[in-house]
């Protein structure tokens, strides 16, 4: 059996890896990319799911108007009320509305104030560090009972590839950046590996509750909540359920105060109700258009469009462009099961961006057939009358056939032997202008 120190170190490593996964955020040398999860739930939606599965959360209502917010505050009849703007981006507390109101999270004891604040939130844009400069329009607010927290802990359930199954990770130090805790105090990180076939054992839930510092009757409460969170994790096909803080109140209740839930996109066919909750209103129109064709698109500030298959290769392409003195205009992931029509639509999206001065295609054909890519490229170039330089690097399945298609097309397409060569040629084509 591994020592407690080894387990803590492994759990800390898992948390740091979790922070780097594309489901949350990806940092590239080319800039800060924040890929939107293809299913992204608002805070109130996550809490509703938890509540429906027996997990204890604060009492709350959702309001679409200031009048509804006022009525909700009265119905709560709470000592103190917290009003939260509902957007997907983080940093709401320090955000600023274009109505002049500062802060997307407010505490008050007066229901009247809730109505007044909601009037300055709903229908206005809230700008935070994670939104575009102009902010994101707030369509709903959450009116919740504000509970005192006497102690904060951290709890997460996530998939661990090294274990080939779910793992529960916890720390008695919650309400803070858990990656920092894992790095500075790994002994405060605890881990329970769950057998996917047997499920969570009561002894595991009790042990985690004890490691989080819950004592007496609170220990049983915490273990019960941990078990319910695990069952929720399985039932909704989550890849991660993170509760921070997972805390206790002065009245002796264990409550999940805030939660982030990530889902397995491949489970959409059996989680239709959950996926129907996805709010795409905060997306850029081009992102929604890309999603119609199973393309993943993220706009950036540069002038070299990237057309790539696979998120990892897309990030590497952005980095190489940056290292060669260029700036990527986007992050476009074509994915695996490619059709010629997708290639055509991808080019339509890329050429619709007025910032784009060159296009770099970087495809590694494992599942992808390079010949299909080549046919899609030539069709797009002809029908869209492409006016910007096009650099193409293809490698893998049917690459020779693909190269012959490009060569015989008679189109002004620049071929590249590898990614470095492609990036240099794309950057040079823009520099000539």
Swiss-Prot record:
The keyword Phosphoprotein applies. The keyword Cytoplasm does not apply. Its EC number is 6.2.1.4. The record marks 80, 148 as: Important for substrate specificity. It comes from the Eukaryota. It is an enzyme of class 6 (ligase). Residues 47-275 form the ATP-grasp domain. GTP binds at residues 58, 91-93, 147. The modification Phosphoserine is found at residues 162, 217. Keywords: Acetylation, GTP-binding, Ligase, Magnesium, Metal-binding, Mitochondrion, Nucleotide-binding, Phosphoprotein, Transit peptide, Tricarboxylic acid cycle. The modification N6-succinyllysine is found at residues 67, 79, 339. GO terms for molecular function: ATP binding; GDP binding; GTP binding; magnesium ion binding; protein-containing complex binding; succinate-CoA ligase (ADP-forming) activity; succinate-CoA ligase (GDP-forming) activity; succinate-semialdehyde dehydrogenase (NAD+) activity. One of its GO terms (biological process) is succinyl-CoA metabolic process. It catalyses: GTP + succinate + CoA = succinyl-CoA + GDP + phosphate. Substrate binds at residues 309, 366-368. Its cofactor is Mg(2+). Pathway: Carbohydrate metabolism; tricarboxylic acid cycle; succinate from succinyl-CoA (ligase route): step 1/1. It is found in: Mitochondrion. Residues 1-38 form a transit peptide. InterPro entries: ATP-grasp, ATP-grasp_succ-CoA_synth-type, ATP_grasp_subdomain_1, Succ-CoA_synthase_bsu_CS, SUCC_ACL_C, Succ_CoA_betaG_euk, Succ_CoA_ligase-like_bsu, Succinyl-CoA_synth-like. The modification N6-acetyllysine is found at residues 67, 74, 112, 133, 140, 201, 219, 228, 272, 348, 387, 407, 424. Binds 1 Mg(2+) ion per subunit. GO terms for cellular component: mitochondrion; plasma membrane; succinate-CoA ligase complex (GDP-forming). GTP-specific succinyl-CoA synthetase functions in the citric acid cycle (TCA), coupling the hydrolysis of succinyl-CoA to the synthesis of GTP and thus represents the only step of substrate-level phosphorylation in the TCA. The beta subunit provides nucleotide specificity of the enzyme and binds the substrate succinate, while the binding sites for coenzyme A and phosphate are found in the alpha subunit. Heterodimer of an alpha and a beta subunit. The beta subunit determines specificity for GTP. This is Succinate--CoA ligase [GDP-forming] subunit beta, mitochondrial. It comes from Mus musculus (Mouse). The gene is Suclg2.
């Amino acid at each position: 059996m591994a020592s407690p120190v080894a387990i803590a170190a492994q759990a800390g490593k898992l948390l740091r890896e979790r922070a780097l996964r594309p489901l949350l955020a990806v940092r590239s040398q080319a800039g800060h990319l924040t890929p939107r999860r293809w299913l992204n739930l608002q805070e109130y939606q996550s809490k509703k799911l938890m509540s429906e599965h027996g997990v204890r959360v604060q009492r709350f209502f959702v309001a679409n108007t200031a009048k509804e917010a006022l009525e909700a505050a009265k119905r709560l009849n709470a000592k103190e009320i917290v009003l939260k703007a509902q957007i997907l981006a983080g940093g709401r507390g320090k955000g600023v509305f274009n109505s002049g109101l500062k802060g997307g999270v407010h505490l008050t004891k007066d229901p009247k104030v809730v109505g007044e604040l909601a009037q300055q939130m709903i229908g206005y844009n809230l700008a935070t560090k994670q939104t575009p400069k102009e902010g994101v329009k707030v369509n709903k607010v959450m009116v919740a009972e504000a509970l005192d927290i006497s102690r904060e802990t951290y709890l997460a359930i996530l998939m661990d590839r090294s274990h080939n199954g779910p793992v529960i990770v916890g720390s008695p130090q919650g309400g803070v950046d858990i990656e920092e805790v894992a790095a500075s105090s790994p002994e405060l990180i605890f881990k329970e590996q769950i057998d996917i076939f047997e499920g969570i054992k009561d002894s595991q839930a009790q042990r985690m509750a004890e490691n989080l510092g819950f004592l007496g009757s609170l220990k049983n409460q915490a273990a019960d909540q941990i078990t319910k969170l695990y069952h929720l994790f399985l039932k909704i096909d989550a890849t991660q359920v993170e509760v921070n803080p997972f805390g206790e109140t002065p009245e002796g209740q264990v409550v999940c105060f805030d939660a982030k839930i990530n889902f397995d996109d491949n489970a959409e066919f059996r989680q239709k109700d959950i996926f129907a909750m996805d709010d795409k209103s905060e997306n850029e129109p081009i992102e929604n258009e890309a999603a119609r064709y199973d393309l993943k698109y993220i706009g950036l500030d540069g002038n070299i469009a990237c057309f790539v298959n696979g998120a990892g290769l897309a990030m590497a392409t952005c980095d190489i462009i940056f290292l060669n003195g260029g700036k990527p205009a986007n992050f476009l992931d074509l994915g695996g099961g490619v059709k010629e029509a997708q290639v055509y639509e991808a080019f339509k999206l890329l050429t619709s961006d007025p910032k784009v001065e060159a296009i770099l295609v970087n495809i590694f054909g494992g599942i992808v057939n390079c010949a299909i890519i080549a046919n899609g490229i030539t069709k797009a170039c002809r029908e869209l009358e492409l006016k910007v330089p096009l650099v193409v690097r293809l490698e893998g399945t049917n690459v020779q056939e693909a190269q012959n298609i490009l060569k015989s097309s008679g189109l002004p397409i620049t071929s590249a032997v590898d990614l470095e060569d492609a990036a240099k040629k794309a950057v040079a084509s823009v520099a000539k202008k």
